[in-house]
Structure formats: structure tokens, C-alpha cells
A protein has these predicted regions:
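N-terminal auxiliary interaction/assembly segments of multi-subunit proteins
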Residues: 1-152
Length: 152
């Protein structure tokens, strides 16, 4: 795995703790729970597209939304999608800033988009299972957008 992707994964895990109060680790031995929502965002990394996505189980999705917003959003799907999308945007902004400090050009190109259910790219640059007491998630990196859904 490239240094850029490793840095992204580290930034993502730190962002979960910092912004959503959710401890998480990479655990490839853990089986992913069924995906409730997939959220993606288009970044540009050193002149190449990088689509990063988070596929979350229902428990993880609502826990992230509630952890980020500071209020329970259980069952409030649209508000929860907005909260997790904003969380993802904040984490990706932090990643962009971190990479720029290291001399790399990483920019956010488009706002997050979401799809209810699983979405997978034809070709992955990286994929890893993230486990947490709040539920399981899959973190995905690709070169082409694969979430055909609504922006928010």
C-alpha cells in the first residue's frame, strides 16, 4: 500500500476519535456487517483522482452521526446522512491539510455523495475493514467514482 493511502487511513481513524468520539482499528479478520449507507468524496491527490468512501453498517452509521453532531440522530435518516457526510468532509479536509504540510497537493474536488446500500468500485486502490464498538465499516479508495447517488 502506498504511503499516501496509509496516511489517509491513519487520518481517517484519528478523525473518528477526534470528531465522532469513536475508537476504531483496522481488522481484516473481522467480517463486515451489511452496509446501510456508502458515502464517497472525490479528492485530487498530486494531480490524480482519489475517490475515498466509507461503507457503514446501520449501527456504525447512526453512531457516527450522533457522535459527530452531539445529539442522537437514531432514525433520522436525512439528518444522519448530512452529519456523516459533514464528518467525512471534515476528515478529508484534515487529510488535505496534513498532506499539504508534507509537500503533497491534495484537494477536495466535490462534496460527499451517498447511496443507501453497498457500492463497490470495479478496481480498488485500497480497502480495509474498520472495527469499532459502534459497529463495522469498510474504508475504500479508488480512482473512479463508483457511488451513483445524491450529493448533499
Amino acid at each position: 500500500m502506498s504511503e499516501l493511502y496509509t496516511s489517509y487511513i491513519e487520518t481517517f481513524l484519528t478523525g473518528l476519535v477526534d470528531y465522532a468520539r469513536a475508537e476504531a482499528v483496522i481488522d481484516e479478520t473481522c467480517e463486515q456487517e451489511p452496509t446501510y449507507v456508502t458515502i464517497s468524496q472525490h479528492l485530487d491527490a498530486d494531480g490524480s483522482p482519489l475517490i475515498v468512501a466509507l461503507a457503514a453498517s446501520v449501527d456504525a452509521f447512526y453512531s457516527l452521526a450522533s457522535g459527530y453532531s452531539g445529539v442522537s440522530l437514531d432514525g433520522m435518516d436525512e439528518l444522519a446522512v448530512d452529519a456523516v457526510g459533514e464528518l467525512f468532509n471534515v476528515i478529508n479536509g484534515h487529510f488535505s491539510s496534513r498532506m499539504r504540510a508534507e509537500g503533497r497537493a491534495v484537494s477536495i474536488i466535490d462534496p460527499p455523495r451517498h447511496h443507501h446500500g453497498a457500492a463497490e468500485p470495479d478496481t480498488c486502490e485500497f480497502t480495509c475493514t474498520v472495527t469499532s464498538p459502534i459497529g463495522s465499516m469498510t474504508l475504500i479508495g479508488a480512482r473512479e467514482e463508483f457511488v451513483t447517488a445524491h450529493t448533499h
